[in-house]
Structure formats: structure tokens, C-alpha cells
Amino acid sequence: MSQLTIALTKGRILLETLPLLEAAGIAPLEDISKSRKLTFETTSPDVRLLILRGSDVPTYVEFGAADVGVSGKDTILEHGSTGFYEPLDLRIAKCRLMTAGIAGETLKPGRIRVATKYTNLAKQYYAEQGRQVDLIKLYGAMELAPILSLADEIVDIVDTGNTLKANGLEARDHIADISSRLIVNKASMKMKHQQIEALIDAISSAVNERAAA
């Protein structure tokens, strides 16, 4: 049987993905959280795990360095590729992609500045709104941008909204609902169809059982 490579990313998505993989008979032989390794053998001899930066997972899957990956819908949309299949919503790491700004302030007319790490999604969203924007690419501490007048709005992931409130900001417009998805390389789906279909079925069952619990 061919080896199957699954790309994951550390953090919340990994913590919520591992139980789904375990339900499919796949568990790392080492504690990922205590290791600096980037590849891990598993209890299934024909499956190995890769630990990547979240934004890199779609790229590894698209170009076949990984057969399967788990990625947030925000990352998939920002990546913008049609180079892989997206057969399953894992219904984990749920949140929303939203605009946000200073609480109580009205957005000024005309051209605005928007800070975000999702520049492609933001460009598309504001174009659909008929709004001209200058985009500022940031990688973290997004809430500081409106506070320090670097930007009029931000586009970011919102979970509870508590971080926004703690920094005097408010969520504004909803852009997309986000959750983690299983993605599959197109060539791998053809070459390793039986293995991948079995994996999808097993994980899908685990997702449904979790939802019913």
C-alpha cells in the first residue's frame, strides 16, 4: 500500500484534528506538542503526518508534497487555488471572518485603509462593496492598527469578540463563516483513491459522531 502524507498545522486546529484522526485509526507515535520534529510516523504504517505553518498547508497539498491536509477555510479562500479537492467540512475551529473598527465610530466616506493578513479576501470583499481601499499586510496584533490610526478597519478572524472589545474595537460586517476543511491533492485522489476514500469515510463518521454527542 502506498504511503499517505497528511499535512497538519500546530495550534487549535491540530488539537481538534487529532481526535478525528485517532477515530480513523491514525495517531502519532510521539507527542507532537513536545517535539521539534516536522514529520511523524503513526499507528498506521502507511500514514505519516507533516506539521506545517498553517498558510503552507494548501500549497503542500496543491503541489503534491502532501496527499491530504487540514486547513482553515480562511486560509483556503486566501490561497485561492483550484488545485485540490475539498471533500469534507470537519466542523472544528469554527469562527467568522469579519471587518472591525473602533467601537462607536462610523466609517468615513471615500478611500480607506484596511489592515489584514487576508489581502486577497479583503480586496475581493471591498470591491464587491464598491469601496476603494489601500490594503496593509500585517501578520499579527491586528487590533493595534485602528487604535494607532494605521488603518480605518481591519479584516480578521473573530471567535468570541472578546479581544476586540478589550481593545476598544467592535466587529462590523460578516464576510464568511470559517471552519477547518479536509483537502486532497487531485492527482493523489486518482492514484490513491481507495486509501483516501477510506480516510474520508472514517473521518466523516467521526465528525458526525462528534456532532451527535
Curated annotation (Swiss-Prot):
Annotated localization: Cytoplasm
Function: Catalyzes the condensation of ATP and 5-phosphoribose 1-diphosphate to form N'-(5'-phosphoribosyl)-ATP (PR-ATP). Has a crucial role in the pathway because the rate of histidine biosynthesis seems to be controlled primarily by regulation of HisG enzymatic activity.
SUPFAM superfamilies for this protein: Periplasmic binding protein-like II
BP term (GO), one: L-histidine biosynthetic process
Record PANTHER family: ATP PHOSPHORIBOSYLTRANSFERASE, ATP PHOSPHORIBOSYLTRANSFERASE ATP-PRTASE
Assembly and interaction partners: Heteromultimer composed of HisG and HisZ subunits.
Major site of localization recorded for this protein: cytoplasm
Enzymatic reactions: 1-(5-phospho-beta-D-ribosyl)-ATP + diphosphate = 5-phospho-alpha-D-ribose 1-diphosphate + ATP
Keywords for the protein's UniProt record, in alphabetical order: Amino-acid biosynthesis, ATP-binding, Cytoplasm, Glycosyltransferase, Histidine biosynthesis, Nucleotide-binding, Transferase
EC number(s) from the headed UniProt entry: 2.4.2.17
Entry's Gene Ontology cellular component terms: cytoplasm
Gene: hisG
Name this polypeptide is given: ATP phosphoribosyltransferase
Comment block on domains: Lacks the C-terminal regulatory region which is replaced by HisZ.
Signal peptide: none
Family the entry assigns: Belongs to the ATP phosphoribosyltransferase family. Short subfamily.
Entry-linked Pfam families: HisG
Pathway: Amino-acid biosynthesis; L-histidine biosynthesis; L-histidine from 5-phospho-alpha-D-ribose 1-diphosphate: step 1/9
Organism domain of life: Bacteria
Molecular-function GO terms, alphabetical: ATP binding; ATP phosphoribosyltransferase activity
Source organism phylogeny: Bacteria, Pseudomonadati, Pseudomonadota, Gammaproteobacteria, Cellvibrionales
InterPro entries linked to this entry: ATP_PRibTrfase_cat (IPR013820), ATP_PRibTrfase_HisG (IPR001348), ATP_PRibTrfase_HisG_short (IPR024893)
